[in-house]
Amino acid sequence: MKKILFLMVAALAIVGCNSNKKSVDIPINSIVDKYTDEQAIKAFKDLKWGMNLDEMINLGYISVEDTSKWVIPLKYKQIGNVEFDDVSIMTHDNRLFAVVFHEYVEGYSSSVHKLYEVKNLFNAQYGSPEFENTVSEDSLKVDVSEVLYLWNIKHKRIKGTIEKSSNDMFFVNVVIEDTITRHLHDSIAIAYQSKDL
C-alpha cells in the first residue's frame, strides 16, 4: 500500500513539473523603471506645500547649513526617472512654495529632450498641458527664457522653460509651485506698492 501511494505521488509530481504552464517574463528594464519611479515618488512623499524649514530638515530634504543660503538646495534631484544637476526650494515667510529643477545642458536637442521627458511624465498624470509652445534653436534669444509647457492644476503650477546661454549651452528649468502661496506673496507685494503710492 505504501509503495502504491508513493508511486502515485511521484507520478503526480512528474506530471505537474511537465505541464505547459505559461511563464511570465517581466523585462528587467520595466523593473528598473518601476523601481526608479517608486523611489522618486517615495522621495517626495512627505514633502508638502507650506512646510517650514525645520520640518524639511527633520525629514532630511535639506541640511541645516544650507538654510542660510538664498537658494536652498534639495537633496532629491529626480522627477520620475529624469535626473537634474540641481534642485532648489523657494520659501516665503519660512514656508515652502516652490521646487525648481534646473540644469545647464549642452546642445539644443538634449535640452529639449530633457524637458519633454518630464512633460511626458506629467502628461500621464495630468493630461495635456494648458499651454504648449514650440520653439526652434534659431528662435531662442540669449538670456531670454521661453516657456515650453505649463499646467495650472488646482493650486499647483508646473512650468518647463529653456533659456539660451553662450555657445551651444542652454538652461533647462522645471518649476513646480504652490499658486496659493505665490498669489498671497504677489498680493502682498501689490498692496505694499499701492501703499507707497
Regions found by a protein language model. Name each.
Residues 1-4:
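Positively charged n-region of N-terminal signal peptides that target proteins for export
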Residues 18-20:
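Bacterial signal peptide processing site
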Residues 6-9:
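Sec-dependent N-terminal signal peptides
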Residues 22-33, 73-95:
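Compositionally biased P/S/T/G-rich terminal and signal peptide-adjacent segments
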